[in-house]
Amino acid sequence: IYEISTGKCLYENAMDEELVTPILNFLLTRDIHMDAFIGGKGYTPIQCVETAQKLTVPSSIKNYIITTRTRLDNILQFIHENQLKVQKMTLNFYPAADGTLIDRETVRKFLVSNPSITTVCGGYNNLEFTRADANKGVGLRKLAEILGVNPDATMAIGDTENDLAIIEAAGIGVAMGNATDAVKARADYVTTTNTKDAVSYTH
């Protein structure tokens, strides 16, 4: 949780080097694109740059991924030498000739077998993982505690699997009109889609 005006980190529950190193060692053998979020900034192994060009996500998202990350020659060395913790990893995949996403299922099975992390999809068939006890719902409750707000007085809006925890934690959970069926099923309300000003929509 960051204070936007100052950039100050108010709360963090990140993966330490001991947890993330064996996972990264495996991921670095796969033909995927990965981002590590450390201290609120995104870092990408240099070998993933070419893979980023092959992603089939919308061009705006691809451009964001390519232009906003710091590229690292050796991400493991960077983490070790600076004694850093990783807040979240985001993985993106590109399709083979038959349309299947290369290495996605292999990576998914590897990640979900690790009880120390939580793995979800954040959209466009990506995979994201954090510590098992770190998710948006935990973050919302911690923010409410910091602000002195009753969690029942909060509202959260989301559309994909990585929003389920925060929708369930909020006093009022709202699903976007373009949300997955699972998100809509857990929400208290469903608004319009993200192309129709859904957040500002009034029921």
What are these regions (language model features)?
Residues 140, 153-187, 192:
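Acidic, Mg2+-coordinating phosphoryl-transfer loop and its flanking beta/alpha structural elements
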Residues 202-203:
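Conserved small/polar residues in nucleotide/adenosyl-binding loops
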Residues 22, 26, 30-32, 37-157:
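Conserved acidic, metal-coordinating active-site core of Asp-based
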Residues 18, 135, 194:
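Conserved active-site and cofactor/substrate-binding residues in soluble primary-metabolism enzymes
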Residues 12, 129-132, 192:
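Glycine- and other small-residue-rich loops at beta-strand/loop junctions that grip anionic moieties
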Residues 5-7, 47-50, 132, 165, ...:
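Short secondary-structure transition/capping segments
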Residues 1-24, 31, 40:
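Alpha-helical substrate-recognition element adjacent to the catalytic core
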